[in-house]
């Protein structure tokens, strides 16, 4: 099992990165809430990973710390939650926000996440409340909404950023029209892909 990778960030294509470790490039899928805190391409990064083996693929899911990975693993234990839905849930809200929703029995907020209907939201609260009751705020490093993300300066690149943002949202489970509408509603000149995704996700919650 691959539990941790320490290498150079070669590519960032939300929600996937390519991390080069000792000459080997690892494709790692990450929740967008983790993606925002990644360093720039070309810099070193440490990612805690969860390794999934399927008949048709071997997949790596990455997180910035062990707490986020632990929550992802708890999600996978819930009935009807696979890696793709777990990734979508933790892209739509931070680990701390999800734990708060479960502990407060706030299924209404969970329903706004892609792939989570009313029954799934209620089941998540029911199944996970006991498992997460001891997860206090001291476990989390608060995510800063003011985190600096480099903007694009070229209009053509900005258009590509919008397309990439839509593609990322679709890969997280949102319908194409919904993703396009969200990106269009928040799009401003010189916005990077990460900023577009972040603001689009916020607009849908």
From Swiss-Prot:
Q: Write down the Pfam families for this protein, in alphabetical order.
A: HHH_5 (PF14520), RuvA_C (PF07499), RuvA_N (PF01330)
List the residue ranges of the region (Domain II).
Answer: 65-143
Segments for region (Flexible linker): 144-156
Q: What keyword terms does UniProt attach to this protein? A: Cytoplasm, DNA damage, DNA recombination, DNA repair, DNA-binding
Sample GO molecular function, one term: ATP binding
Q: Where is this region: Domain III?
A: 157-205
State the superkingdom. Answer: Bacteria
The principal localisation class reads: cytoplasm
Tell me where it resides: Cytoplasm
User: Could you tell me what this protein does?
Assistant: The RuvA-RuvB-RuvC complex processes Holliday junction (HJ) DNA during genetic recombination and DNA repair, while the RuvA-RuvB complex plays an important role in the rescue of blocked DNA replication forks via replication fork reversal (RFR). RuvA specifically binds to HJ cruciform DNA, conferring on it an open structure. The RuvB hexamer acts as an ATP-dependent pump, pulling dsDNA into and through the RuvAB complex. HJ branch migration allows RuvC to scan DNA until it finds its consensus sequence, where it cleaves and resolves the cruciform DNA.
Q: What's this protein's family per the entry? A: Belongs to the RuvA family.
Q: What is this protein called?
A: Holliday junction branch migration complex subunit RuvA
> Can you name the source organism?
Pseudoalteromonas translucida (strain TAC 125)
Q: What is the lineage of its organism?
A: Bacteria, Pseudomonadati, Pseudomonadota, Gammaproteobacteria, Alteromonadales
Gene name, Swiss-Prot/TrEMBL = ruvA
């Amino acid at each position: 099992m691959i539990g941790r990778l320490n290498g150079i960030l070669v590519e960032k294509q939300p929600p996937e990165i390519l991390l080069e470790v000792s000459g080997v490039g690892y494709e790692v899928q990450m929740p967008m809430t983790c993606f925002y805190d990644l360093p720039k391409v070309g810099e070193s990064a440490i990612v805690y990973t969860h390794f999934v083996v399927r008949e048709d693929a071997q997949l790596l899911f990455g997180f910035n710390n062990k707490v986020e990975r632990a929550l992802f693993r708890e999600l996978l234990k819930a009935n009807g939650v696979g890696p793709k839905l777990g990734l979508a849930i933790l892209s739509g809200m931070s680990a701390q926000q999800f734990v708060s929703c479960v502990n407060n029995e706030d299924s209404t907020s969970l329903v706004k996440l892609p792939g989570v209907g009313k029954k799934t939201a209620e089941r998540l609260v029911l199944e996970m409340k006991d498992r997460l009751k001891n997860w206090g705020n001291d476990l989390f490093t608060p995510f800063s909404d003011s985190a600096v993300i480099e903007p694009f300066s070229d209009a053509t690149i900005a258009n590509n950023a919008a397309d990439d943002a839509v593609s990322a949202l679709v890969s997280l489970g949102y319908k194409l029209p919904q993703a396009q509408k969200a990106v269009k509603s928040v799009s401003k000149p010189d916005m990077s892909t990460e900023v577009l995704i972040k603001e689009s996700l916020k607009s849908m919650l």
